[in-house]
């Protein structure tokens, strides 16, 4: 993906509001991705003005899935027309939550591919991810994901 500034993440993830937990991709390649997400009062995982632990894990999973998901699209496909994907967390190998962000804060998620197995139309992968605000780490985790092309 060469022009990530024009990338509409909704075209590459199967999630839709109110369950979309990524606003934009900051950088992406075959082994790393960085995303951002602004916490809003109407987010499904906000309770009493705080984005919950479950929301942080879901944000990490959506961020992680974009590394493997991008391989199902052509390099110049910034419209997300090349494939439709589904995916889910198959295991949470480890998770540590240090703090939860408040409404109005923007979180940054950085994920790295640890391992990957590809079959004809699906991938099973392990990824590590950290989620932070500008001044502190909120979450670190290792997730297993299953990603499948459905068309």
Regions found by a protein language model. Give the residues of each.
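Hydrophobic beta-strand-centered segment that forms part of the acyl-chain substrate-binding groove
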Residues: 2, 68-110, 142
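Beta-strand-rich interaction surfaces with strong enrichment in secreted/lumenal proteins
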Residues: 10, 24, 48, 96-100
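Catalytic strand-loop segment that frames the active site of acyl-thioester-processing enzymes
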Residues: 16-56
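HotDog/MaoC-like acyl-thioester-processing domains
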Residues: 34, 66, 70, 101-151
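Ordered, amphipathic secondary-structure segments that act as subunit-interaction surfaces
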Residues: 20, 62-73
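Short aromatic-glycine motifs in intrinsically disordered, low-complexity regions
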Residues: 6-16
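Short coil-to-beta-strand transition motifs
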Residues: 15-21, 103-108
